């Protein structure tokens, strides 16, 4: 289903919002896994599936979002950041967000999201650079601490841990879903079970 800025533009005026530079699509975990299995063989020439772990063989981190990229496009110049990510992020793309189930208990829901934030913070150690200026002081301090810890954990392991955390409740019945591969400041967004299962 359409999501985020793409959904806003579609509902508001039937087009793109001016400040958005990509397309956003959300899947339940089950549908996402099916999509990534068939997409490589079904995407047209010039488009490809880019998983986060495909960049530099999973040794670096940008985020946990899988994308469909349009290879015949360039968005940025040949910058140091683009070279760090092998030029794979220098394209027009479709973000593929994953909806996973959250435990119904307040403590279980909090713990799932908290652990995702910890893994994301540790993964930031494997980015091309860290810009703490965009965070408030407490968040900047915690991000710095986590990124120092992340220096001692291989990024490939963090990718596996994040995937396990995201899907650990997928077989359980629950009333809420969340965006498990989105950035931490949006983990507060949850969706009702009926909305996800009826729409997707």
Residue ranges and their predicted role:
Residues 106-112:
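A short secondary-structure junction signal
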Residues 116-118:
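C-terminal helical/coil "lid" or tail adjacent to the Rossmann-like core of SAM-dependent
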Residues 1-23, 27, 32, 36:
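Active-site nucleotide-donor binding segment shared across nucleotidyl transfer reactions
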Residues 1, 39-104, 120-200:
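Conserved catalytic core of two-metal-ion nucleotidyltransferases
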């Amino acid at each position: 289903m359409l999501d985020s800025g793409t959904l806003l533009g579609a509902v508001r005026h039937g087009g793109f919002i001016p400040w958005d530079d990509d397309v956003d699509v959300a899947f339940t975990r089950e549908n996402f896994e099916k999509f990534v299995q068939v997409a490589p063989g079904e995407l047209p020439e010039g488009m490809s599936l880019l998983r986060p772990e495909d960049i530099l063989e999973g040794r670096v981190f940008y985020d946990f979002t899988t994308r469909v990229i349009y290879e015949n496009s360039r968005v940025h110049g040949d910058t140091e950041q683009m070279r760090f990510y092998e030029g794979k992020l220098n394209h027009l793309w479709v973000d593929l967000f994953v909806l996973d189930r959250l435990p119904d208990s307040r403590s279980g829901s909090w713990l799932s999201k908290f652990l995702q934030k910890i893994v994301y913070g540790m993964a930031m150690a494997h980015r091309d650079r860290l810009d703490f200026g965009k965070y408030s002081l407490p968040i900047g301090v915690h991000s710095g601490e986590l990124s120092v810890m992340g220096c001692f954990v291989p990024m490939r392991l963090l990718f596996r841990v994040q995937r396990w955390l995201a899907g650990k409740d997928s077989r359980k019945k629950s009333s809420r879903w969340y965006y498990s591969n989105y950035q931490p400041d949006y983990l507060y967004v949850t969706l009702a079970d009926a909305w996800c299962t009826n729409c997707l």
